[in-house]
Structures are given as structure tokens and as C-alpha cells.
Amino acid sequence: METDLLIGTFVNATTNSEYLSPFLLKHPIGGKVSSEVEQVVRQMAKKFELDGYEVSEIAEDPINGIELQKGFYLISGAETVVMFQRMEKQLQRQMTRFDMELMTWVMYQSGLMVTGADYARVAGDWDRYAKAMMQLHDTYDVLLLPTVANTAPKQDAYSLDANLIEKMEHIHELSHEDRQEIVWKMFESSVEDTPFTQRMNITGQPAISLPVGRSQEGMPIGVQLVAAKGREDLLLMIAEQWEQDELWKF
């Protein structure tokens, strides 16, 4: 069973605690967070509350997850091109479809169409995301959110359909916009399950995933703690406390 989009909830420390810790459940790219994952995150928020924290809610994620993800693909494509250009120089020949598996070929071909202006725009967006999270941490010390939106998938969960594979094979014939659409479709199902970790790769914040829950089928469920740059100590402090409280589940 799955739930619809959820709003973010922030946990404000009372005088009994030194730190302020928000938690966020809203799916960054418009998908769904499973009810079991939601339950575990709320249980950990409840622990904050029982430890003397006051829970309140906010309506909006400070970062546009779809915008962030699309920019991530643009930069990844451009960096894939740079990687293969270096290989071409070493090998003294052009890279071809037969040098790599299909998904890498798609990223390579998408990157060939990325302009300097595209790259500069996304780089500016990333600075804006980092600033938004820095402002969040001006008020709140540690962010609590799911590690993933659902429990571990089956091995074939992210198999690509034949129609998409055909388009991927001919991506070099498509426009810049169509190439980016192919990249989005290629990763869409997997990113719907794993939408919560990308922002830290971009903003440079430290994060830690802790195994604090299990589904009815016995699958592990983690929550993620995120701090401001340079504050790994807060994450390790909370992780140690939760371990001492025997909250970890293996």
C-alpha cells in the first residue's frame, strides 16, 4: 500500500534539547512514499518528540526535486563526454556504441548536445540549492528523511521496455530536448524509489543512513540524517545515541 504526496514536517527542539531537527517526507519528484517507509520516519520523529522535541509542519520542500534531477542528468552527460574524450585521446580513435553498454551510450550522446550555457545555468542552480539548504540549517541542525521511498525492489523492477530501448539505440538521431527526455525515462522508475539522496551529492552536505525499521516482509527500512557542511559530528552523535537505544535493526 502506498500513500500520496506528503508534506514536510519539522521537529523543533524544546529547552530540553540543544539541537533542532526537521524531518521531510514529501517525494522530491512527485512520486509516492510507501506507507511502511512513512511509518518508520514518523516513528523516529516521534522519538524526537518523546525526547522533548515539538513537532510542526511546513508545506514546501526548499528544493525543486524535478529541476534538480534534470540538471543532474545534464551535468552527468557532459562529464561523460569529457571522460570519453580523454579515452579517445589515449586510444587515438573515436568511441563507438560497441565500446560501452547502452545506458552509458545514452548518457554520452545526451552530453554531446549540452552547451556551455546549459552547464553554467545548472551550476548556478546548484549554488542556489546549496544556499537554500544552508538557510535551512541556519534554523535547524539535522534533517531527518527517508533513505529511499520504498523497500528494496525485485531484480527486474527497473527493466526497460522494448520501445524505450529502441529509442535509446537511436538517440544520436534525436534533438537535445528528446535526448534529455530519453535520459529521464531511462532512470524514471529507479529514481522514483531513490529520490532523497541526490541533493546531498549536489549541495555537499554530510548525510548518514541508519537501519531503524523493517517492513512486514522483513525488508530493511532506513532513515537518513543530514547536517550542514562540516557538521558530521552531529550525525555521528545521533547515530551513536540511537545505537545505544537499540533502535538499529539488522
Language model regions located:
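Amidase signature
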Residues: 1-198, 202, 230, 241-250
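A short, aliphatic-rich beta-strand micro-motif
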Residues: 208-210
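Residue-level structural signal for beta-strand termini and adjacent loop
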Residues: 212-213, 226
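Flexible loop/coil segments at beta-strand boundaries within sensory signal-transduction domains
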Residues: 215-217
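Short, well-ordered beta-strand elements
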Residues: 219-228, 235-236
